[in-house]
C-alpha cells in the first residue's frame, strides 16, 4: 500500500485498532527464476522479489513481503516507534484471535525474536535469532560488548 494510505489508516483507526500481518507464501525468498507450484502452476520469482504467474508478469501468484518489511514500513509511513510497530505485529494479532500473548515475566515461556533495526530507511530489519522455549532455533544470539 502507498505510504499515505497506511498513514491514513493508522490515524483513522489509531494504533489500538490496527494489526500487522503477512500472507507471505512459501516460495517467497527463493532466488529469482521459474518454479512449479502445486497450488497455482508455474510461477516466476522476479529480481525484485515479486511472485507472478510464469509468462504473465501482470498477475501476482502470491505475497512476498515479510513481516519485518511491514514493521519497517509502518514505522516510516506512519511515523511510528519500534515498540508500537512490533506490538502491532505480535501482541495485537495474538489478542485478536484469543491466543496467549507472550510476556517478559518470571515463569513465562522464553519465546522471542532478536533482530537489528536498520539505521537508514533503505535497510531492512534483520532477524538475528529466534528463541523458542529458551532454545535458539534459528540464528545466533548477539551479545553486546561490555
For the regions a language model picked out, list residue spans one by one.
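Glycine-rich anion/phosphate-binding loop at the beta-strand->alpha-helix junction
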Residues: 1-3
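C-terminal cap of metal-dependent C-N hydrolases
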Residues: 100-146
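His/Asp/Glu-enriched, well-ordered alpha-helical/loop segment
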Residues: 5-115
Amino acid at each position: 500500500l502507498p505510504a499515505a494510505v497506511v498513514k491514513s489508516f493508522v490515524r483513522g483507526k489509531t494504533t489500538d485498532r490496527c494489526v500487522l500481518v503477512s500472507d507471505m507464501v512459501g516460495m517467497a525468498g527463493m532466488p529469482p527464476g521459474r518454479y512449479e507450484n502445486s497450488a497455482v502452476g508455474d510461477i516466476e520469482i522476479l529480481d525484485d522479489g515479486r511472485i507472478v504467474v510464469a509468462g504473465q508478469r501482470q498477475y501476482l501468484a502470491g505475497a512476498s513481503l515479510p513481516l519485518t518489511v511491514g514493521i519497517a514500513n509502518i514505522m516510516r509511513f506512519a511515523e511510528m516507534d519500534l515498540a508500537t510497530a512490533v506490538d502491532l505485529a505480535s501482541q495485537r494479532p495474538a489478542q485478536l484471535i484469543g491466543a496467549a500473548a507472550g510476556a517478559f515475566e518470571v515463569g513465562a515461556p522464553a519465546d522471542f525474536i532478536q533482530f537489528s533495526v536498520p539505521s537508514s530507511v533503505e535497510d531492512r530489519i534483520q532477524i538475528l535469532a529466534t528463541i523458542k522455549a529458551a532454545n535458539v532455533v534459528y540464528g545466533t544470539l548477539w551479545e553486546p560488548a561490555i
